[in-house]
Amino acid sequence: MTKREKRVVILADTQTHMMPALAREMARRNHNLVLGDARDGLADELIKLGAKVEVVPDTADQTKEDTIQKLVDRAVDAFGGFDSACIRTGTHGIGTIMDSTNEDCRIQYEGNFRSVFYALKALLPPLVEQKSGQIVINTSAAGARVQEWFALYGATRAGANELIHAAGLEAAPHGVTVNGTGTYAMNYPSFLHDVGADTDPAKLKAVTDQLPMRKLCEPEEAAYFVATLIDGHGTFQTAQFFPIDGGWSFM
């Protein structure tokens, strides 16, 4: 157990997706924060919520071995360490095996698998040493339902989910939990663009009609769920993958 006046959470990246909402939720849950590449104005919002905030720039490229280590180092320098982390990883891509190139394979492997390995290598040692901590790596629900039209993306996400599973088992005897989450159909610009819904509302309906929940996931919904895995209260579930996808991965 640690003796910091407040729990400290590392979040990366906090530009988009559920991550700005997660930062706000963690501040509400009485955490100080170390942020990778924060959205403009986000740090000021968090300070108004009572949090101390450290922003580490130039941490967008998680295929670099030292990217997440920079966040760990800042947490140690500013707060004496950290208690939990959520890292959003990934490089999107579509294509069948026959349509994909060797370069496509390299990009997907580095963005979706190696980035997770680097994150775990940076985050696990200090938490194992202090005998407590929680890690969530956000991958994608695509890893739980690989389809032929996103073969490399789904396969590398699936591999990352299994790496997280192994990390959870490795860290469990040391009081550290490691879990994965994966979203699908989130209401944010990149997803809307990927499905063409940013220019054609009919395409959005085509997506939601295929979901058991018949709606998109709001970033705040996903953030609230993930916050529960890293706020220090629920510390028994580990080595799990939790899809946040409205039931899509079970269809």
Enumerate the predicted regions with their spans.
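Canonical Rossmann dinucleotide-binding motif of NAD(H)/NADP(H)-dependent dehydrogenases/reductases
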Residues: 2-34
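Substrate-binding pocket helix/loop in short-chain dehydrogenase/reductase
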Residues: 96-97, 101-109, 196, 203, ...
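C-terminal substrate-recognition "lid" of short-chain dehydrogenase/reductases
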Residues: 117, 215-244, 249-250
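Active-site helix of classical SDR
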Residues: 120, 156-157
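Alpha-helical segment proximal to the catalytic Tyr-Lys
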Residues: 125, 169-170, 235
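Residue(s) in the substrate-gating loop at a strand-loop-helix junction
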Residues: 140
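Short, small/polar-rich loop/turn modules that mediate ligand/substrate recognition or access, typified
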Residues: 172, 177, 237-239
